[in-house]
Regions:
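Conserved, carboxylate-rich catalytic/transport cores that coordinate ions
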Residues: 1-188
Length: 188
């Protein structure tokens, strides 16, 4: 059981405006209690993002969409959802909180449920290999499981190209689903 005490009910778009320096006086007043903490949070996020990149963590584009509804609640449009720096910061801090909780439980030998992501299986990797070959991308891992760093390099290589979305989706489908177990088995 956990309790989260929020001092401010934050809204991503408002936090993004504060981070960008474009927030109006009303928004700044709403966040006065935490405003001076935002630069340190931004710096911590940037540091964690650098560490993640150095480790070769895979950074998938989510491709989330939002539904635009009319006054009757009927969908009239679908738009790609964009996220700003505040969403990325919160996601990073939630991951860090989970890692700290898991580490604490392991060190103190407290029973715990760990989130486990196993490496991709052979069949899914074969499909990814075929997709990459069809896109003219040499993957160098036809016979073995690639490291996350290798997959990350492929994603980085297609960023901004016509292949970006299909490779991102193909790689995401290749990943094993996360499961929860009593023993920490690591995270691919």
């Amino acid at each position: 059981k956990s309790i989260i005490c929020s001092r401010v009910k934050g809204v991503y778009s408002e936090i993004n405006a504060l981070l960008a320096g474009t927030a109006d006086a009303e928004t700044q007043a709403k966040y006065a209690e935490v405003l001076d903490q935002l630069p340190a949070m931004k710096e911590l996020y940037a540091h964690r993002a650098r560490l993640r990149k150095e480790r070769g963590c895979i950074d998938f584009e989510s491709g989330e969409v939002k539904l635009i509804l009319d006054e009757n609640g009927h969908c009239i449009d679908v738009k790609k959802r964009t996220s700003g720096e505040s969403e990325a910061m919160i996601e990073e801090f939630m991951l860090l909180a989970n890692q700290c909780a898991a580490h604490f439980a392991r060190v103190k030998q407290i029973p715990f449920v760990y989130r486990v992501h196993e490496e991709p299986n052979g069949e899914k990797l074969e499909r990814l290999h075929s997709l990459l070959q069809a896109c003219g991308i040499n993957d160098h891992f036809a016979k073995e499981v690639p490291t996350p760093k290798e997959l990350s390099a492929i994603l980085e290589g297609v960023r901004g190209t016509p292949f970006e979305q299909i490779v991102n989706t193909g790689m995401l489908r290749c990943m094993s689903k996360a499961c929860y177990e009593e023993k920490p088995k690591g995270h691919y």
